[in-house]
From Swiss-Prot:
It is found in: Cytoplasm. Optimum pH is 7.0. GO terms for cellular component: cytoplasm. The lineage of its organism: Archaea, Methanobacteriati, Methanobacteriota, Stenosarchaea group, Methanomicrobia. GO terms for molecular function: coenzyme-B sulfoethylthiotransferase activity. It comes from the Archaea. Pathway: One-carbon metabolism; methyl-coenzyme M reduction; methane from methyl-coenzyme M: step 1/1. Binds 1 coenzyme F430 non-covalently per MCR heterotrimeric complex. Coenzyme F430 is a yellow nickel porphinoid. Methyl-coenzyme-M reductase is activated when the enzyme-bound coenzyme F430 is reduced, probably to the Ni(I) oxidation state. Its EC number is 2.8.4.1. The keyword Transferase applies. This is Methyl-coenzyme M reductase subunit beta.
Length: 18
């Protein structure tokens, strides 16, 4: 979330998809 915007977005996306 600090310097990993893409990583954070991926985590949220995975949660939303699943």
């Amino acid at each position: 979330s600090d310097t990993v915007d893409i990583y954070d977005a991926g985590k949220i996306l995975e949660r939303v998809i699943i």
